[in-house]
Amino acid sequence: PVAPIDEQQRIADFLDAKCAAIDALVADIQSQIDTLEQYKRSVITETVTKGLNPDAEMKDSGVQWIGDTPAHWGVIRGKYILRYMQKPVRENDGVITCFRDGEVTLRSNRREDGFTMSDKEIGYQGIDVGDLVVHGMDGFAGAIGISDSRGKASPVLNVLDTDQCKRYIMYY
């Protein structure tokens, strides 16, 4: 349908105003989301390095970026509390991916396209529900989590076991 030119102009003016208002709301909400994500990161960092008791006696951790930690806590390298696991791949398992938001799940749970499949799954390993998984290249960016799925993964994912609380390690 084609409206008269003056009505087209009014429609365009109306839509310009409405879309600008919606865009402003989206920008404001995105700013709030960014602020909340930053706050979430600070709460996690503060809690895993300082604990839950703000009145606890503190000591120097010996690690510059951590600073002081509760006096009754120890500082130990990850290699002493984490063990690499190598599990066999099961036939017909789907591919698991460790995403930067910390989700470790079957790739098909997140998307259907936009990734490549490997013809030869050399070095692939099995992953079970509850496994602690760290992405070998994106772990620093948050690609660490606990698997919610059973499947297989490329060698870039590290499956780890620990006697510590896996959820705590995931946040750390």
Describe every region a protein language model picked out.
Residues E37-V43:
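Heptad-repeat alpha-helical coiled-coil segments used for dimerization/oligomerization
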Residues P1-E37, P70-I76:
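Amphipathic alpha-helical segments
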Residues D13, A24, E46, D68, ...:
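Residue-level signal for well-ordered alpha-helical scaffold segments within enzymatic catalytic domains
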Residues V48-A56:
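Extended intrinsically disordered, low-complexity coil regions enriched in Ser, Thr, Gly, Ala
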Residues E37, A56-D60:
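Short, tandemly repeated low-complexity microdomains enriched for cysteine and small residues
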